[in-house]
């Protein structure tokens, strides 16, 4: 009977150790994933900043990703250049306004 208890205790110890190692590995993977997401968040272009060279690199806003909006600028020399900035398109602004108004009403 004593041998059975020792074997059971040994098995329980091994199982708990292996499951804790698995949890540690899972936590490490989650941490790496969060760090990678934070890195991409830092690399995105904030609202109202220039995105001429990277038109798909705008950050996310409250509800939608900002869009790179471009305009043609004419210099005093008559040269036309394209300038772009990250901003919220009008239809996204309208949707955010409706959602904000709905939150105020329905709380």
UniProtKB/Swiss-Prot annotation:
Q: Which cysteines are joined by disulfide bonds?
A: 44-59, 51-68, 58-86, 70-84
Q: Which residues form the propeptide?
A: 21-41
Compartment list = Secreted
List the InterPro entries hit by this protein, alphabetically. Answer: Spider_toxin_CSTX_knottin, Spider_toxin_CSTX_Knottin_CS
The record's keywords, sorted A to Z, are:
Disulfide bond, Knottin, Secreted, Signal, Toxin
Chief location of this protein? secreted
Tell me which tissues or organs this protein is expressed in.
Answer: Expressed by the venom gland.
The signal peptide, as residue positions, is 1-20
Q: Which family does it belong to?
A: Belongs to the neurotoxin 19 (CSTX) family. 04 (U1-Lctx) subfamily.
Q: What is this protein called?
A: U1-lycotoxin-Ls1d
Give the source species: Lycosa singoriensis
């Amino acid at each position: 009977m004593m041998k059975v208890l020792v074997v059971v205790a040994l098995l329980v110890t091994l199982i708990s150790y292996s499951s804790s190692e698995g949890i540690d590995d899972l936590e490490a993977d989650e941490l790496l994933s969060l760090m990678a997401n934070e890195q991409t968040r830092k690399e995105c272009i904030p609202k109202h900043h220039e995105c001429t060279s990277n038109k798909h690199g705008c950050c996310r806003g409250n509800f939608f990703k900002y869009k790179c909006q471009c305009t043609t600028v004419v210099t005093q020399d008559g040269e036309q250049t394209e300038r772009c900035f990250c901003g919220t398109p009008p239809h996204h602004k309208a949707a955010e306004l409706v959602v904000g108004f709905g939150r105020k009403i329905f709380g």
